[in-house]
Amino acid sequence: MQVRSAAASDAALLHELAAVTFPLACPPDALPESIQAFIDEHLSEAAFTRYLADPQRELFIAEQDAAPLGYAMLVHAEPTDPDVLAALTSLPSSELSKLYVLPDAHGGGIATSLVERCVSSARARGAASVWLGVNQLNSRANRFYEKSGFERVGIKRFKVGARYEDDFVRARIL
């Protein structure tokens, strides 16, 4: 298994991964049409094309024998959400904005490899911490992030469709 930097030509692949993996991280009672609308707006091929062109973002793809297993996106910019800013104590901080692994690859160390690549990149860019938001009801992800050194430091709002969720803000000091 390898983790590589995503290229501009990976926008369609990243969209395909996101379309499969994002619904798995949503609350069980999230409406399918709200999930799809979020994917269409924030995880489309066009959205990934924009993300890949943004110098403040880095995207990574985990692969095994050239088959994609998951992806991560790191944002090297100060958070604009006041709840996140209030929760963070070590600045500057990069955001682990996206971390998703295909269901068949869960438990194989892929997410850990992606996190460590993101942490290494954030450290190289001078970040004092890495933060993320995770749904409070996503117990699997919360256990993983805790095991990976991300402490719960606050709560922020996350909108899917017309509904707001209260996500945990987690941070890892570098």
Predicted feature residues:
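Acetyl-CoA-dependent GNAT
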Residues: 5-11, 15-28, 36-108, 112-117, ...
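Terminal substrate-recognition subdomain of acyl/acetyltransferases
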Residues: 164-174
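Extreme N-terminal starter segment of soluble prokaryotic enzymes
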Residues: 1-3
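Conserved active-site tyrosine of GNAT-family acetyltransferases
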Residues: 145, 150
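Conserved beta-strand-loop-alpha-helix junction that forms the acyl-donor binding cleft
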Residues: 132-142, 159-165
